[in-house]
Curated annotation (Swiss-Prot):
Entry GO MF terms: UDP-glucosyltransferase activity
Broadest EC class assigned to this enzyme: transferase
Family classification: Belongs to the UDP-glycosyltransferase family.
Name of the protein in question: UDP-glycosyltransferase 82A1
Organism in which the protein naturally occurs: Arabidopsis thaliana (Mouse-ear cress)
């Protein structure tokens, strides 16, 4: 009797922590729906995630990225771009052309758009994957209109920084919120070109899968009047490609699928902080983490924030890379961890476990999408300091639309204390968090996500 093989789906994440994590959750969701997932990452990432997840039924394959040190995760945006455009494509093409490989689809992180053309050439259906808030994609999608109206130049430079960006079903954004405005002017122009190329490549996609939920902008002013118009226009997309399928938040899928990704972190998590958290009063601890992808807030700001946290007298847990810990004020670590027992500083924290701990009262965050949704799932208030990319759009929703957080204006004692007071003492914020959690992760949201998974499964079988 011939055994029928499960159809394979190949997943190509962008090689960064905040992109690999949701892609692994997506792969596990398809595994539970009868597919055989194959996740392809650079060697350095492959080593970190494959060993601890090898028994799940997900196949992990390594891609050469041409790095001199294959054991070190890639960190520079433009060196990663060079690897993706010039080194990785032939490797994926060889895999797709293997005669005995039954590939139903290739799922490509839109930041790894190089893989779209490879799959197209091999005649394999392609789905794009947007691992962050869909509002950020809509801002990228608006690039041609931003250029046409003169808000930005042909090279992506804002003509007027104070100018407001107005889009249907979006909060008002400023030109400073544009996600390619990172680094030097030269780097910003190169990032803008990167996004233009990405947009051009998405035209051949059949679907775009998102790690967001369909009602993310329900609280935007005048939403109800424009939502139907937008849906009629989109439907999702009125029969035109690519079709938008909201599947998120994806970390919420594990409870439904009964499949748990053992480890998604590239770094060793310091579990010792959990015991310290258990000793603290409920809703008292400030948790601080500015993410994994970019250098955080800068050495001078780290020093200022450290002294402000100490002056606050509040207990805190700070996830801070060991390299950046070297820039902390002299004697700070000993004072707060030993003398006062006020806080703990770890190089990397088990974030989900931390946020679920009853002692945590608020989360000082860079507003990364994964972190934001984990905080919402745990009903944690947010004190926001966006650093790069889509984080500025996320922050706008957190503070102005959903009203589940406060934007931190600076790192001095007064700014930090004012921010903490506002976020901790808002009597209505807890209720707004509960409502958002229900909307994003409740029964209706899960049903909507499941319908989209079922639709896609039927399309691929």
């Amino acid at each position: 009797m011939k055994v029928t093989q499960k159809p394979k789906i190949i997943f190509i994440p962008y090689p960064a922590q905040g992109h690999v994590t949701p892609m692994l959750h997506l792969a596990s969701a398809f595994l539970s729906r009868g597919f055989s997932p194959v996740v392809m990452t650079p060697e350095s990432i492959h080593r970190r995630i494959s060993a601890t997840n090898e028994d799940l039924g997900i196949t992990f394959l390594a891609l050469s990225d041409g790095q001199d040190r294959p054991d070190a995760p890639p960190s520079d945006f433009f060196s990663i771009e060079n690897s993706m455009e010039n080194i990785m494509p032939p490797q994926l093409e060889r895999l797709l052309l293997e005669e005995d490989l039954d590939v139903a689809c290739v799922v490509v992180d839109l930041l790894a758009s190089w893989a779209i053309g490879v799959a197209d050439r091999c005649g394999v259906p392609v789905a794009g994957f947007w691992p962050v808030m869909f509002a950020a994609y809509r801002l990228i999608q608006a690039i041609p209109e931003l250029v046409r109206t003169g808000l930005v130049s042909q090279k992506g430079c804002p003509r007027q920084l104070e100018k407001t960006i107005v889009q249907p079903e979006q909060p008002l954004l400023s030109a400073e919120d544009l996600p390619w405005l990172i680094g030097t002017p030269k780097a910003q122009k190169k990032r803008f070109k990167f996004w233009q190329r990405t947009l051009e490549r998405t035209k051949s996609l059949r679907w775009i899968l998102t790690s967001s939920f369909k009602d993310e902008y329900e609280d935007v002013d005048n939403h109800k009047a424009s939502y139907k118009k937008s849906n009629d226009l989109n439907k999702e997309n009125n029969g035109q490609n690519p079709q938008i399928l909201h599947l998120g938040p994806l970390h919420n899928q594990e409870a439904t699928n009964n499949i748990t990704i053992t480890k998604t972190s590239f770094w060793e998590e310091d579990m010792s902080c959990l015991g310290w958290l258990q000793e603290q009063n409920p809703n008292s601890v400030i948790y601080i983490s500015f993410g994994s992808w970019v250098s955080p807030i800068g050495e001078s700001n780290i020093q200022t924030l450290a002294l402000a946290l100490e002056a606050s007298g509040r207990p805190f847990l700070w996830a801070l890379n060991r390299v950046w810990q070297e820039g902390l004020p002299p004697g700070f670590v000993h004072r707060v961890t030993i003398t006062k027992n006020q806080g703990r500083i770890v190089s990397w924290a088990p974030q989900l476990e931390v946020l679920r701990n009853d002692s945590v009262g608020c989360y000082v965050t860079h507003c990364g999408w994964n972190s934001t949704m984990e905080a919402v799932a745990s009903s944690r208030r947010l004190l926001c300091y966006p650093v790069a990319g889509d984080q500025f759009v996320n922050c706008k929703y957190i503070v102005d639309v959903w009203k589940i957080g406060v934007r931190l204006s600076g790192f001095g004692e007064k700014e930090v204390e004012d921010g903490l007071r506002k976020v901790m003492e808002d009597q209505d914020m807890g209720e707004r968090l509960r409502k958002l959690r229900d909307r994003a992760m409740g029964n209706e949201a899960r049903l909507s996500s499941e319908m989209n998974f079922t639709f896609l499964k039927n399309e691929l079988n």
